[in-house]
Amino acid sequence: MAASAALILPESPSMKKAVPLINAIDTGRFPRLLSRILQKLHLKAESSFSEEEEEKLQAAFSLEKQELHLVLETISFVLEQAVYHNVKPAALQQQLEMIHLRKDKAEAFASAWSAMGQETVEKFRQRILGPHKLETVGWQLNLQMAHSAQAKLQSPQAVLQLGVSKEDAKNVEKVLVEFNHKELFDFYNKLETIQAQLDSLT
């Protein structure tokens, strides 16, 4: 029950905007929408719906394109939080009602999560553990001279060399990633965020 209690959905401006839009969706169609999003939730690079399907959803739910995207993103966010906290269906329903989602919609979330939650969590585990493993990290600095004769500034680039292996192979594949100063700083900040989230879960 500790994991369930840890799930807290923030009442952010986008969440407050999305809740009435979700509440207005036809209750009969809502479970199918949830089911489709849950099926593809673990495929981060892939959208749950094609452009043509999104147009049909806009018409069916009487939503503008931007409103539909907000609804889909919010539903995905809620379900991702349920995955990361491995929350119980009843706790998910309770949290959704606390952010003013109508009871029928909160129940639909809980019902979909009860039916597909564990399967979705397992898909996420497989994606996270994945077939690739980081074996080595190397780095070097490259200095590139500016092409302009007037500007003799050097543009330093950091090159990370990542050695990754697959579980079923002995060879280590080398992946080179190049960063300028800003890109490296942004990457560092992302690592800090990831580290903070890991620390909060351990």
From Swiss-Prot:
Tell me which residues bear Phosphoserine.
S155
N-acetylalanine found at: A2
Sorted alphabetically, the Gene Ontology cellular component annotations on this record are: cytoplasm; nucleoplasm
Keyword Signal found: no
Task: Identify its protein family.
Answer: Belongs to the COMM domain-containing protein 10 family.
Q: What is its main location?
A: cytoplasm
Q: What are the entry keywords?
A: Acetylation, Cytoplasm, Nucleus, Phosphoprotein, Transcription, Transcription regulation, Ubl conjugation pathway
Query: How would you summarize the oligomeric state and partners of this protein?
Result: Component of the commander complex consisting of the CCC subcomplex and the retriever subcomplex. Component of the CCC (COMMD/CCDC22/CCDC93) subcomplex consisting of COMMD1, COMMD2, COMMD3, COMMD4, COMMD5, COMMD6, COMMD7, COMMD8, COMMD9, COMMD10, CCDC22 and CCDC93; within the complex forms a heterodimer with COMMD5. Interacts with RELA, RELB, NFKB1/p105, NFKB2/p100. Interacts with CCDC22, CCDC93, SCNN1B, CUL1, CUL2, CUL3, CUL4A, CUL4B, CUL7.
The protein's role, per its UniProt record? Scaffold protein in the commander complex that is essential for endosomal recycling of transmembrane cargos; the commander complex is composed of the CCC subcomplex and the retriever subcomplex. May modulate activity of cullin-RING E3 ubiquitin ligase (CRL) complexes. May down-regulate activation of NF-kappa-B.
* Phylogenetic classification of the source organism: Eukaryota, Metazoa, Chordata, Craniata, Vertebrata
What is the recorded name of this protein? Answer: COMM domain-containing protein 10
Provide the COMM domain boundaries.
133-202
What is its subcellular localisation? Cytoplasm; Nucleus
Q: Which domain of life is it from?
A: Eukaryota
